[in-house]
């Protein structure tokens, strides 16, 4: 299941405008920077440092595209809500040092919200803070364009042994859908790339 989700992410990234433009011109970026923002799904809780999806994405892109260097930075911690991620991104945006490694990215990925749901935070908090995070993420791209941001849907942990041990997995799935629907609609309305990994995550109990 994890490989299937990664495959969808990679295919979507490779179809982004920056790669299409480079292909049309017969060239590829020489140096490429990716920043991944999120929580445990991004950092890869309980997996090796090279096994999380940003690092696997890096390896796949290096094998696919002619890049001299490809650097990946991650701002993500297990348990982070949208509020916690905002509090960590703000100092990055305020740091105007030329040594700030988190700015001027060719691609930014954003996967956030599962802990808002899990910690029973008011949904209105996500409605307010997700669009704010999207804008901050765009500000961290080199182009300052929504074309270079990819939002990834929240996987459904109800379809894991942990999720099945909870009091009501079906409620978890309904709430995950509510978060993802809001995020997807916001992305559609603002021309932002949105990748749905939730459907594949719901095969977790059979794969």
Spans of model-derived segments:
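Sec-dependent signal peptide recognition
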Residues: 2-8
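C-terminal motif of bacterial Sec signal peptides marking the signal peptidase cleavage site
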Residues: 12-15
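Residue-level detector of flexible, active-site-proximal loop/helix-junction positions
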Residues: 41, 79-81, 156, 201
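A generic structural signal for short coil/turn motifs at secondary-structure boundaries
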Residues: 43-46, 83, 117-121
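Charged, often glycine-rich, active-site loop that binds/positions anionic groups
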Residues: 78-96
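Alpha-helical cap/lid subdomain in secreted, periplasmic
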Residues: 90-207
């Amino acid at each position: 299941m994890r490989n299937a989700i990664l495959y969808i992410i990679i295919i979507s990234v490779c179809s982004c405008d920056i790669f299409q433009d480079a292909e049309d011109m017969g060239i590829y970026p020489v140096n490429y920077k990716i920043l991944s923002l999120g929580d445990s799904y991004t950092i890869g809780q309980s997996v090796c440092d090279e096994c999380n999806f940003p690092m696997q994405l890096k390896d796949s892109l290096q094998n696919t595209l002619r890049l001299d260097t490809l650097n990946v930075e991650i701002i993500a911690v297990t348990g982070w809500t949208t509020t916690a991620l905002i509090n960590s991104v703000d100092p990055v945006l305020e740091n105007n040092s030329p040594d700030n490694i988190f700015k001027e990215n060719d691609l930014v990925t954003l996967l956030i919200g599962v802990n808002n749901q899990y910690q029973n935070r008011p949904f209105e908090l996500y409605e307010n803070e997700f669009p704010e995070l999207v804008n901050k993420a765009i500000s961290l791209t080199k182009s300052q364009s929504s074309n270079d941001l990819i939002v990834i849907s929240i996987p459904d942990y109800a379809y894991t042994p942990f999720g099945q041990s909870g009091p009501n997995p079906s409620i978890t799935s309904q709430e995950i859908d509510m978060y993802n629907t809001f995020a997807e609609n916001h992305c559609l309305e603002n021309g932002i790339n949105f990748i749905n990994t939730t459907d594949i995550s719901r095969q977790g109990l059979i794969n």
